[in-house]
């Protein structure tokens, strides 16, 4: 988060170090953090554009199937102690041909970044931001006209992917 104020409040779920530290402090094996990620990503993918509490509930139900070897209480503790998203979707713009979608994502400190989903016949390509602003100064790019404000942390980058996943799944329903 170079150049930015430290994050406050509940930690972001997609911060791998915080999540692993949390599960180990609660007496779980560190691998539980990876399993939590898997069930939450699955819940996001399967649920589409649902509210965060519904994603946590679905993730909790996935513990029951036994394949994840994840204690249900681990999901409950994570849902109480982490924000699923510290960022939020501020704006969505669809291209006329509906093959490209730009998402404006507002970070917890109020800064905004852009992510883009480009749909092709056999795949979807995603472009995510790793910084707020840019030092290059390219006049054709909105981000390039801003000064470099700071770097995103890993969880903010991963949240962009998760928010795009959530949006694309809801869009395809």
Residue ranges of model-derived segments:
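Flexible, acidic/Gly-rich N-terminal and inter-domain linker regions that tether
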Residues: 1-124
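Conserved Radical SAM active-site core
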Residues: 58, 113-173
